[in-house]
Amino acid sequence: MWRMILVMTVAALGIGGWYAAANYSLEVHRSADGQFQYVRIVPRMPSGSVPSEGAADQPPAAPARPSIRLATFDLDGLDDNRLGNPKVCDSLVRILSRFDVVALQHIRAGNRGLLMRLKDQINATGRCFDFVTCPTLDRDQVEIYNAMLFDATTLEVDHSTVHSVDAPPGTFHVRPLVAEFRVRGPPPSEAFTFMLVNVLVDPRRAPQELDSLADVFRAAGHSGHGEDDIIMLGDFEADLDHFGRLGRVPWLVAAVNGVPTTTRGTRLADNILFDRRATVEYTGRSGVLDMIRELDLTPQEALDVSEHLPVWAEFSSYENGQASHVN
């Protein structure tokens, strides 16, 4: 009898250990100088994605609004040292909290700790922001990743869709990050749903990566999820006239044209792209946030935040919402 109980106990422990290893992982958090801080158990997600902090505790939806604002912001290698600068941190909180979802590029950190601290700083103002991310670096040992930061009261993410683009090694230095969202507030059957493809083009290989992004955009529309509103946004390191094959995708339009998106005002590098036939939810309103003017920063203070400016575009909260003319 005791032998049977012992066997059953060992078997249960073995099955439990296998289940834990298959469904959870240990996330080691370290300080900026590499010192151990703590270990956190996090659930594994499909395609290596990392769940957002509030996935199991969604806040109440905000009242329905006519539109939402999407943005992209290249953080220019944001690390712990820069986030530790009170002026930089305050500026980021003021910028990011203006939007419903922001595609962030070029975060430089060994784990998600930096992104968690940034989210916590925003939420300390009374907001309910969350994020999703997953491994996107294709090569090298430097930890660079992209993420989607969003207001959890106005948007919800389908965690099963969060993944980095599967491409042959060497296609991208930082593989595009993909996630699908739905607006909260309107009835689910009427709410705008969309797929974001967050990109960071390597300036040393811009022509090749831009050509490959044409394939990514086309493939996203045939991913099997049935989503036709594909929005590709990020740092393209080029304007629409120099997009190569990506610029020749039929009906592809850019939210901003002829406007610098760098803090020094020298070039257009960042943008938001979509198919104007499919994404009729675009309201026609978009722009580039001038950090110096909007936040009353000096040129150097703005450069301390990033070499890039946030680019934004507005979309209807409702599926097939009224569209404005796109030039």
List the predicted regions and their residue ranges.
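Divalent cation-coordinating acidic motifs and surrounding scaffolds
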Residues: 2-327
